[in-house]
């Protein structure tokens, strides 16, 4: 085969594979078997391996995944990916319709398009000359994270558009996982000893945020496209026409459940139908999106700061079920906090079997008046987290039992103390096995040291065999140690050891968060890392030095100094250092004209996003905070500013408009 023949055959294979992928994933009309598709794909891979110069940005081989990234890059959206206003009742839906007709000065029924509100992750796909060039998350609506390589691995996202596609097309869609695929994914993770995902949305979000796209490629992700940002050339006249155009271009659109309806009465009827049919769908939805169909009317209605006036999201009410509290067990966390958890007679809520529900603390138990044996109403708040919301006292038979406040730790029998102002008692025993287990789970978590492959089941086995007695022992584990754990094969053990070794040089902020210092979350851990620059400097910081930092109050200052004062913690830190754990130092924030100044942004900002505002302030040495206090130096007020603005006036704090703030920043940067 000469060069010209190779090029022709390669292009032919690309075209054939793209075509069959569209037929299978977008149109559900496969023409060849999976085996035939695999044969074509293998031929393509062999050609690319032999002649790498053939590979293009449109190659179907990109579905497999590319080289891992070190970090995601910011991607600005040419047009904001706006949020939607919510309607929680049918009355609010009628109010929305009344506003639309008032703005249009018309009494005639409005034509609406109704679409399913997928419970997934919003993304943007940018096609240039019909080829997928950039993919990103929604982010804050103005800027997302570049996840192009990950999105290319999703089979239902076309790498190349079909038909007479526009030169530029920005597509908005929702990435999700089918319920059956989600159950299968969690079962596989359980088998591997990995932490399971809480729900399909979390699984989709976690899959998209993988730095290694080969991991994303293994996840059963799908997409439904629902709108556009920019479109070159002629625009369709209506939203439903736009959906049909997108479908013709090879994009996956949920036409099956989209409806074009005349007037709000038809819309509310369809909303009721969806609520009844919700459990029949193969994926999670949390409502219905209603849009004015006429695109010219959409432009006339325009947008508010964060939401379009021409669309609304009708949210389903939380789904509930009635069951029985079979027991109330006590759970010990990494800080020693003892929390009550209701063990329930298994019941299905929102398509998920629920057998446990949080009771939070004994104040909540008293408020609900819940006893062991009670019949209760359980709700998955946001269709995710189970909660007991009501006790049906009329079902009591006198056999119910209360759960007293524990006098000793249920895990180790050690002393328990309930401090003034706190709602839960705490185990005081540092060697408590339950505290150790939870501390290690926190230490290895993705947002902390990110030790992939060290799941809850493996941690339990390592503790049971006494192979680890502190987080420092993780770094002394051998392959032989790991092979003692059930369901941990040779290859998995090697991968886990690699992940443990890679965690030794995590950024200081991540390391501080992993230590589990009480009251120090991700944000404060990052703040302390930037302020002090090294673990040694922070460990020697005085209470006064900590209090001098904005956002650090007495509670956090005491917690940090107490942590480094405890001999057990110093021993663990020394052991981590001996094991080669060396958190990457972060540069101490340099001074600037706003050093020591605290800013609060309130109201609807139109000139910049909150993230951009924070970056401007921090660039000049200042800090952005979320609340107004006596320590606040300046409040920047956007449209419809509320209680924060009022509090600033009461405290006589300087107040700036967005324009005045930008002028101040320009002046300081030019100085």
Curated annotation (Swiss-Prot):
The active site is at 117 (n6-amp-lysine intermediate). Keywords: DNA damage, DNA repair, DNA replication, Ligase, Magnesium, Manganese, Metal-binding, NAD, Zinc. GO terms for biological process: DNA repair; DNA replication. GO terms for cellular component: cytosol. Pfam families: BRCT (PF00533), DNA_ligase_aden (PF01653), DNA_ligase_OB (PF03120), DNA_ligase_ZBD (PF03119), HHH_2 (PF12826), HHH_5 (PF14520), Nlig-Ia (PF22745). It is an enzyme of class 6 (ligase). Its cofactor is Mg(2+); Mn(2+). Zn(2+) binds at residues 409, 412, 427, 432. It comes from the Bacteria. Residues 589-671 form the BRCT domain. InterPro entries: BRCT_dom, BRCT_dom_sf, DisA/LigA_HHH, DNA_ligase, DNA_ligase_CS, DNAligase_adenylation, DNAligase_N, Hlx-hairpin-Hlx_DNA-bd_motif. DNA ligase that catalyzes the formation of phosphodiester linkages between 5'-phosphoryl and 3'-hydroxyl groups in double-stranded DNA using NAD as a coenzyme and as the energy source for the reaction. It is essential for DNA replication and repair of damaged DNA. PANTHER family: CHROMOSOME TRANSMISSION FIDELITY FACTOR 18, DNA LIGASE. Belongs to the NAD-dependent DNA ligase family. LigA subfamily. This is DNA ligase.
